[in-house]
């Protein structure tokens, strides 16, 4: 399953930076909530390909986590898509894994 393997690749990349990696689940879900030295570093959703069938689910999970952790930005890591979604005062950036992993 490409989705599971892809999520594991993102986890391994995050793990190189910190051990404080968590999962968020309330009404919706966020794949990775990352802290570094006790401070939130990022909110990440992993999606092989964003489309009409999963867009709402992926964004809703991030918006809920952004509200919970009071974060203005979050990321969706994709296989090869780039986009920016501005929802109110929140910004979600979708970017390909190969670009994101260079950071």
PLM regions and their residue ranges:
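A cross-kingdom feature that marks ATP-driven nucleic-acid transaction machinery
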Residues: 1-103
């Amino acid at each position: 399953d490409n989705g599971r393997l892809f999520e594991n690749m993102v986890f391994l990349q995050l793990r190189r930076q910190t051990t404080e990696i968590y999962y968020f689940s309330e009404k919706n879900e966020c794949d990775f909530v990352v802290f570094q030295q006790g401070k939130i570093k990022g909110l990440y959703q992993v999606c092989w390909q964003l489309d009409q069938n999963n867009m709402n689910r992926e964004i809703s999970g991030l918006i809920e986590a952004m509200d919970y952790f009071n974060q203005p930005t979050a990321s969706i890591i994709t296989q090869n898509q780039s986009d920016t979604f501005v929802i109110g005062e929140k910004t979600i950036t979708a970017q390909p894994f190969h670009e994101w992993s260079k950071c």
